[in-house]
Amino acid sequence: MKIEANHIYQGDCLDLMPGIADASVDAIICDLPYGVLNRNNRHAKWDRIIPFETLWAQYERIIKPNGVILLFGQGMFTSDLMQSNRKLWRYNLIWDKGRGTGFLNANRMPMRCHEDICVFYKSLPVYNPQMIPSSPLSRNHGKGKMNKLTNNCYGTFKPSPSVIADEKYPSSIIYFPKGHNTESWLHPTQKPVELLRYLIRTYTKMGGNFRQYDGKRDYLRGRHHGEATVYRHGKRTEVFCRGREAHQRG
């Protein structure tokens, strides 16, 4: 079956991805199952880790040579994810959720306020840093050491113009509040739209082709036309797919 852009597909991603042409996707953004929820919980049957070898075979086939693969993770799953493809792993972003989870264990361990976003690619992808406004006291400016063109970390390097700006480059820690469960919160592990919008703006060009899925049996393919084109992906069950379709219709 051919997978078309701007559609939600309910099914196993490993069955659906063969319908995507080779080297046709600019970005893959995925919230994989972490395999951390109680297996006896009948509402968490979707939280089963997808076989990495099979998953990477499809990812590496459909991604463009300079495309990017962004995969959410946490704890030991992040470690396993990084180890699953050491050749393509580059770095991690830290998503600060602004709200802790794990309150039942708060007297035993710190509550968790962040998740990882593992960044993989074959060749250097598009990178549009989303600049951060800065106050006059913390403006991006030179340190008066333009004559020093070597250091212990980078060795010798070329000088660059010294520019005083009202914004600075982003760091690896990005803050987007997760929010609270509301009628618009369609799944307990869904990610904020603004976070996904940030990732799409950072790693794709206008008109880029991205795919996004969440869990083993969810699939979404879309095209980045600008601010309006950000999708919330469907979940395994039919009720979540219907919810996503209703959300997109507005």
Where in the sequence are the language-model features?
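Core catalytic lobe of class I
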Residues: 1-231, 238-241
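Catalytic-site neighborhood detector that most strongly recognizes the C-terminal catalytic loop/helix
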Residues: 249
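Short functional hotspots where side chains directly engage DNA or cofactors
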Residues: 242, 246
